[in-house]
């Protein structure tokens, strides 16, 4: 349903209570597992294919990677300002093209439940990180066959950054051990690996690194949010950080910590376990580069133990050269949450001023021109969208949609064009009148609402293959603006294209089904989430499947082209 005007919702406390009940400890402990297909089904996905990697390869004479062609898509944009916008010329697609798409090919990956990564597209090559399969592929955009394959030897965590260093194209990404990989984009050969973690802080690397000149900027998402669910754990120890590495060697240049190292606080849980803090304020997503101001902007999540800090649920500006903190905008103070809070666990200690709502910033801040000024715009899981002055961090405008949730309102980020900001909202269904899943637009200059589309569940003929079809259908994945269209997708696997000016639905496609694949691996789609939507070289690419949080697993990368 399209609405010509936006509406800023008031806060309904019962919504949060009911949603948190859904996030029981049992649910969160299954993060990362597949639900629509069992583990055995995933293992069987490769049966009948003697070697699924070999079956994916292009003919020997068709494996050359031409890096002299145009870079048409990177997750952060070439400038690193994260606009999630590509022009018609850059993408090779017009709004009219996007209103009539057809499937060109599909490739599947065995033992895979989630398609979480954004690709890099250079000319006729799409570089894709099959994170569950521990591999990076250089795929031909026309056919889907592989020109080369890099085996990292362990699961990967992030999307990829692309840069040209000393005349050579490189790809940079992280793995689940906290290591950064640099490989040749032309051949897939490894240049080096190095730790991306900050000292004395063993955190995950989730967000995409950014290449800027001679440096790689690495976000660190340490927090203890998961281990806090263990009642015997002395919660909590780790915290968010940023490291800067030498792009040629991986040597560390500087590091920034969102807070001091945790110490024993003198507090004990209800079961007598000692508590540590401060902790948390993880940086889940990609830093934003502002070369003109020589600044980096990062967004953070909640604290995971007491004492809380001024850097949680915040947007932070750092000096690009030194990592020194320049300013901090905190959207919500005293948000202390860990997995113990989902089931009233002993490590969830609620004080008088504790919010305990888990309202991270899950997506990056976007640096965008709005008339005669620049703004820094970001969406939050509270359902807020914030616009700041990048010089000082001062608030310019703010709007809020609904109550927000621990897995929404805005989960993985927003997109912009020259006139509007577009925010996806992932409120789950069945939560009463305050559930507002959909796509919302705001005029950049003023923050005034434009149009919004309130998505509704569609279970007819689909509920037998969609887990929780009536509740999981909101828009969680990071949206993308191409020319005059906005591309987004639902946790029920539906892909949507909207007219950016009016909100009219231009195209819809159900990806939650089985697919024939170019490499012979059994392919099936599911929830579309994370950073799984991209466009470039005249095509739209979508990763379908996201098995975390009781969502629908899948293992396919889908390529769409304008219908002939």
Language-model features: locations:
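Blade/loop signatures of beta-propeller domains
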Residues: 43-103, 258, 263
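Repeat-blade elements of multi-bladed beta-propeller folds
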Residues: 70-80, 112-135, 153-180, 202-234, ...
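Bacterial N-terminal signal peptides that target proteins for export
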Residues: 10-25
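Beta-propeller blade signature
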Residues: 238-251, 311-324, 436-447, 554-563
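Surface-exposed loop and turn segments in beta-propeller and other repeat-based domains
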Residues: 107-109, 195-200, 253-277, 326-356, ...
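Bacterial N-terminal signal peptides
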Residues: 22-34
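Conserved blade-register residue in beta-propeller folds
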Residues: 138, 182, 244, 317, ...
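Short loop/turn segments that connect beta-strands within beta-propeller blades
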Residues: 140-143, 184-187, 246-249, 320-322, ...
């Amino acid at each position: 349903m399209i609405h010509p005007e936006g509406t800023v919702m008031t806060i309904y406390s019962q919504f949060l209570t009911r949603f948190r009940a859904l996030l029981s400890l049992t649910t969160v402990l299954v993060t990362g597992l597949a639900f629509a297909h069992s583990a055995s089904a995933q293992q069987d996905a490769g049966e009948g294919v003697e070697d699924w990697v070999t079956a994916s390869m292009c003919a020997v004479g068709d494996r050359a990677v031409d890096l002299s062609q145009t870079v048409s898509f990177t997750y952060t944009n070439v400038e690193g300002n994260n606009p999630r916008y590509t022009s018609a010329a850059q993408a090779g697609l017009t709004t009219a093209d996007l209103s009539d798409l057809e499937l060109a090919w599909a490739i599947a990956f065995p033992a895979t439940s989630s398609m979480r990564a954004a690709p890099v597209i250079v000319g006729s090559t799409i570089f894709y990180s099959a994170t569950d399969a521990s591999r990076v592929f250089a795929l031909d955009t026309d056919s889907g066959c592989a020109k080369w394959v890099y085996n990292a030897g362990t699961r990967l965590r992030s999307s990829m950054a692309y840069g040209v260093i000393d005349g050579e194209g490189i790809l940079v990404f992280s793995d689940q051990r906290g290591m950064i990989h640099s490989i040749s984009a032309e051949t897939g050969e490894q240049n080096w690996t190095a730790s991306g973690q900050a000292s004395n802080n063993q955190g995950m690397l989730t967000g995409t690194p950014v290449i800027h000149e001679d440096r790689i900027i690495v976000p660190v998402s340490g927090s203890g949010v998961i281990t806090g669910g263990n009642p015997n754990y002395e919660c909590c120890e780790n915290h968010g950080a940023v490291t800067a590495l030498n792009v040629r060697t991986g040597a560390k240049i500087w590091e920034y910590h969102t807070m001091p190292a945790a110490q024993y606080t003198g507090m004990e849980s209800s079961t007598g376990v000692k508590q540590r803090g401060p902790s948390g304020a993880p940086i889940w997503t990609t830093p934003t580069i502002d070369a003109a101001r020589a600044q980096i902007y990062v967004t953070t999540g909640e604290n995971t133990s007491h004492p809380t800090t001024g850097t949680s649920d915040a947007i932070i500006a750092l000096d690009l050269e030194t990592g020194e903190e320049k300013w901090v905008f905190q959207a919500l103070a005293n948000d202390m949450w860990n997995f113990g809070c989902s089931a009233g666990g002993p490590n969830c200690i609620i004080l008088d001023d504790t919010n305990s709502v888990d309202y991270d910033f899950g997506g990056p801040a976007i640096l965008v021109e709005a008339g005669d000024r620049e703004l820094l715009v970001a969406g939050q899981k509270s359902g807020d969208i914030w616009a700041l002055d990048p010089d000082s961090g001062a608030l310019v405008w703010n709007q809020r949609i609904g109550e927000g949730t621990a897995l929404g309102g805005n989960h993985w980020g927003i997109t912009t064009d020259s006139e509007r900001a577009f925010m996806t909202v992932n409120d789950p269904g069945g939560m009463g009148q305050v559930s507002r899943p959909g796509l919302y637009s705001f005029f950049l200059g003023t923050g005034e609402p434009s149009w919004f589309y309130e998505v509704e569940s569609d279970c007819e003929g689909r509920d037998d293959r969609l887990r929780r079809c009536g509740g999981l259908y909101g828009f969680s994945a990071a949206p993308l603006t191409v020319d005059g269209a906005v591309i987004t997708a639902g946790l029920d696997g539906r892909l949507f294209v909207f007219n950016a000016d009016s909100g009219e639905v231009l195209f819809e496609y159900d990806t939650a089904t089985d697919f024939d694949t170019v490499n012979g691996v059994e392919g099936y789609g599911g929830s579309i989430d994370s950073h799984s939507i991209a466009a470039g070289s005249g095509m739209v690419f979508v990763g379908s499947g996201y098995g975390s949080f009781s969502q629908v697993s899948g293992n396919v990368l889908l390529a769409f082209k304008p219908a002939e």
